[in-house]
């Protein structure tokens, strides 16, 4: 299994998908193995790359995995994070400029997951702090304080949005099991990170009491 992960999956991303011209990773490859350099770059894809190489480095300690994780982390923080309103854009063009600026909380959860795993692997304080910033974005703008749970999406400046779907194949409902699962996942990793690396926590950090409340 480790051989498949390292020499098939991770090696593929290292050898074929790093965008050395524009930064980060390519957004698409055809079924025939042809890179599409002009393809948009999605938040979820990049956050998953960040988590994957961060976790690989934490377990296997290979320097090239750390380099790939750092590449993904730096690209996300530089290009996907909205410097004006906070949160993360849904997608960028191939040059790293915002393309779809809506705030999909499913995607923001993935960025938290990736950043928190990078902080677990490296002890990087900035990654932890930026993960916490995104946590507070979700708590402020997605948490339904009246009925509970989390809404799906908002506009760039956190206003209500008519189309909350992740894709054309999804139902346009204000809440979904899918998004809730992918909020539990990063919140759990934040909790794990704070237990493993207490030196990173600050007075602003999420309280354990609040995280435990989500268990019920």
Please provide the spans of the model-predicted regions.
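Aromatic- and histidine-enriched alpha-helix N-cap/loop-to-helix transition segments
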Residues: 37-52, 102-113, 126, 174-185
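Histidine/acidic residue-rich metal-binding segments in metalloenzymes
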Residues: 199-208
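Well-ordered alpha-helical scaffold segments within catalytic/enzyme domains
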Residues: 48-63, 110-124, 182-197
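Carbohydrate-binding/catalytic loop surfaces
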Residues: 22-41, 87-107, 149-176
């Amino acid at each position: 299994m480790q051989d498949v992960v390292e020499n098939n999956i991770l090696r593929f991303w290292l050898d074929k998908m790093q965008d050395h011209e524009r930064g980060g990773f390519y957004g698409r490859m055809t079924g025939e193995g042809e890179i599409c350099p002009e393809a948009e770059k999605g938040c979820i894809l990049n956050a998953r790359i960040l988590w994957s190489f961060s976790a690989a480095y934490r377990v296997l300690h290979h320097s090239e995995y750390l380099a790939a994780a750092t590449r993904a982390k730096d690209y996300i923080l530089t290009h996907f994070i909205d410097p004006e309103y906070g949160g993360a854009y849904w997608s960028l063009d191939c040059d790293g400029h915002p393309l779809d600026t809506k705030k999909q909380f499913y995607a923001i959860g993935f960025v938290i997951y990736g950043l928190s795993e990078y902080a677990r692997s490296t002890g990087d304080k900035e990654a932890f702090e930026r993960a916490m910033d995104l946590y507070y974005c979700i708590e402020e703008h997605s948490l339904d304080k009246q009925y509970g749970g989390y809404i799906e999406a908002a506009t760039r400046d956190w206003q209500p949005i008519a189309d909350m779907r992740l894709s054309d194949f999804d139902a346009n409902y204000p809440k979904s099991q899918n998004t809730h699962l992918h909020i539990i996942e990063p919140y759990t990793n934040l909790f794990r990170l704070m237990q493993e690396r207490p030196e990173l926590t600050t007075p602003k950090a999420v309280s354990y009491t609040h995280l435990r409340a989500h268990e019920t």
